């Protein structure tokens, strides 16, 4: 697989097609991308001027933004590739500098259900997390709620995992959870 974290957020359709053609030529079968990106993902519009959420509310998605996500998933599918789809980068789950996180257990469930329903028939592998470890019980609860929402929406028919930081595996937190299809061990972002 390849990582194109900012794919939905930065590129236009022509650039997306070029990128996917290039990855297909190189033999990639999975492209990982995040819907709510880490780098100004809530405040900077995509190439077509759309923000992902209405008033930063995860229970209200912006249709124009998600039409581009739909486009990417369809175009990848035409090339025999699945999308490793991260609903959000983990920075939106972590409280920082006294500021509340975007997600709480309730809106994480609703957001997950919206996405699970929307993409239940698509070639998607769900990847929660985003280069962060689960540090607090509240973070754990938020990820659990999002996973439950996705499974409610898609009927539990798609693979799902969690993307931790480097040299750590998702099994530390979620190995025995019914929604976890496989563990992810990130080999990058650490010194040898």
Predicted regions and their residues:
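Active-site mouth of glycoside hydrolases
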Residues: 1-191
């Amino acid at each position: 697989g390849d990582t194109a974290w900012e794919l939905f957020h930065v590129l236009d359709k022509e650039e997306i097609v070029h990128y996917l053609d290039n990855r297909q030529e190189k033999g990639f079968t999975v492209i990982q991308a995040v819907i709510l990106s880490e780098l100004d993902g809530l405040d900077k519009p995509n190439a077509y001027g759309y923000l992902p959420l209405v008033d930063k509310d995860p229970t209200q998605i912006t249709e124009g933004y998600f039409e581009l996500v739909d486009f990417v998933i369809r175009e990848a599918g035409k090339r025999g590739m699945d999308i490793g789809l991260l609903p959000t980068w983990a920075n939106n789950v972590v409280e920082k500098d006294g500021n509340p996180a975007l997600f709480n257990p309730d809106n994480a469930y609703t957001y997950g259900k919206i996405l699970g329903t929307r993409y239940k028939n698509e070639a998607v592998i769900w990847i929660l997390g985003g280069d962060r470890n689960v540090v607090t019980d509240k973070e754990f609860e938020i990820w659990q709620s999002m996973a439950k929402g996705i499974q409610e929406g898609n009927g539990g028919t798609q693979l799902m995992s969690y993307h931790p930081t480097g040299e750590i595996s998702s099994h530390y937190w979620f190995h025995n959870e019914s929604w976890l299809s496989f563990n992810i061990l990130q080999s990058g972002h650490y010194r040898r």
